[in-house]
Amino acid sequence: KILDFEYASILIKLVVMWYVLQVFLSIIALLVKIFRLIYEKTSGTKVDESRRRFLHGVVWVPAISATLYGGLYESRNIEFVEQDIDCSAFPKLNGLKIAHLTDVHLGNFFSVRQFYEILNEIAHKAPDMLVITGDIFDSGKINDEAIKILNAFTPYFPFGVYFCWGNHEHIRGIKHLQEALSKTNIKVLNNQSIKILSGDKPLYLLGVDYVDERGGQ
C-alpha cells in the first residue's frame, strides 16, 4: 500500500507543481506587461522586442527554481535538532530524552513512506518518549495508514507516544481521527495533562487543543 501511494503521490506532486508554476508565471507575466505599459506611456518609447523576449525567457528561471525547491527539496530536507536542557534542579529528569515531532502535513508533498522513515530515524535515537504537536494527519486518503504506522512504533518509546490536535486535524475530520486514535496506544491529550514522573517534583505533560478551532476558548 505504501508503494502504491508513493507512486500516486509522485504523480500528484508533479501535477500540483505544474499548476503552482503556472500561477507563478502568470503573475510574473502580468507584472512584466504592466511594467512595459507604464514604461511606454511615461517614456514615450516602446520596449525593445528582442529584450522583451529575453526577459520573458528569464522569468521562467526563478519560477521553476522556486517551484522545484518547495516541491522537491523542502519536502525531503528533514532537519533533526537536538537540544540539551539544564535539569540540575530536577535530578530525576537527568538523562530523559524527549522527541518532538510537529507539522509533517502528510499528503501530496509528504508521503507515508517518508513518515515511516522519520519515525524510524527518531526510534534509532532511542528517546524515552515521543510528543507530537499536531498538523500531522493532513490527508484523508492516508491518515488511517499513517496512524497504523505511528502505532507500530509505540513500543520503541518506553514512556509512551503523546499527541495533541493541530488545526489541520480539525480540517480533515477530527471525529474520524479521534475514533481511529482511540484504538491505538497513542495517547491523545485534549486539554488534558498526564503525570510522567512521580515524586516531590513530578513531571506533567500537558496537551492543548488548537485554540482557533474552539472559538478562542
Model-flagged regions — what are they?
Residues 33, 40-41, 76, 137, ...:
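Charge-rich, low-complexity amphipathic helices
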Residues 89-217:
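Soluble catalytic domains of enzymes that build or remodel membrane lipids, polysaccharides, and related
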Residues 62-68, 81, 169-171, 186-189:
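Short amphipathic alpha-helical surface micro-motifs
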Residues 38-58, 71-100, 107-120, 124:
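N-terminal signal-anchor transmembrane helix
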Residues 1-75:
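Non-catalytic terminal accessory segments
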